[in-house]
Amino acid sequence: MQDRLTRLRNILEKEGLDGLLISSRPNTFYYTGFTGTTSKCLVTKENAFLVVDFRYSVQAKGQVYTGIEVIEHEKDVNDSLNTLCTRYGVGSLGIEGEDVTFSGYHSLCENLKDVKTMKDIQDSLNRVRIIKDSEELLLIQKAVDLADNAFTEILPFLKPGVREYEVALELEYSMKKMGASGVSFETIIASGPRSALSSRVSMSSR
C-alpha cells in the first residue's frame, strides 16, 4: 500500500503543499487501512500519521499500512495535529472540502498555529481513487462473485407469498455466510408493481 502514500505525496508536490489532512472515513480507510469511526490522517513529504483517541489505539496499530505511525491524542485531536504540523514544518495544508464542515474549518484555523494556508484537495484525492490498482481489482471481482453466488443460492427461496424483507434477510445471510463483511447499503427487494418504483427499502409486501 506504499503506492497510495506515494500518490498522496504526488498531490503534495503538484499542489505545492507541505501536508495533507485526510478526515473522511472512506478516504481514511482507503489510504490507511483503518476502519474506525474517529481519526485524522496527516501526510507530509516524508512522514504519515494517523491520530486517534484511546478507544482506537490498539485497533489502529493492527490495521494501518506500513509507513503510517499511530498517534494517540489525549484531549483534542487538533492539539496533536498542531504539534505534528509544527514539528514537521507544515505551513500549507490540503484538506477534504467535502468532509470538513464550516465549524471544523474554523477550528483548524484556530488550532493549527503554524499553518498559514489551507487548500481544498478533494478533487485530487478523488481522481487518485478512480484508477484501481491490482489489489482493488481482485477485491472487486471477489465481491461480484460472492454476490452472484449468494443470489444463486437463494433462488429456491423465491416463491409466491414470501415477503420482501424476508428475501432481503435471506440474501444478506447468504452473503455473510460466504464471507461478506456487510452490505454497501440497505438491501432493496421490490416485487410486483413495486418493482417499478425508484430505490426504496424492502417491506412486508409479498
Across the structure, where does each feature detected by a protein language model lie?
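Short beta-strand segments
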Residues: 22-23, 51, 96, 190
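Compact, glycine/acidic-enriched structural inserts
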Residues: 53-79, 83
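Short helix/loop capping segments that flank catalytic or ligand/cofactor-binding pockets
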Residues: 30-31, 59-61, 103, 197-200
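Short, basic/aromatic beta-hairpin or loop at an interaction surface
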Residues: 19, 182-195
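Short, polar loop motifs at secondary-structure junctions
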Residues: 52-58, 100, 104-105
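Terminal domain-start leader segments
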Residues: 1-49, 58, 78-82, 86-89, ...
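Flexible, acidic/His-enriched mid-domain "rim/lid" segments that flank
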Residues: 3, 76-183, 194
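Acidic/histidine-enriched ion/cofactor-binding microenvironments in catalytic or ligand-binding pockets
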Residues: 43-44, 87, 183, 195-206
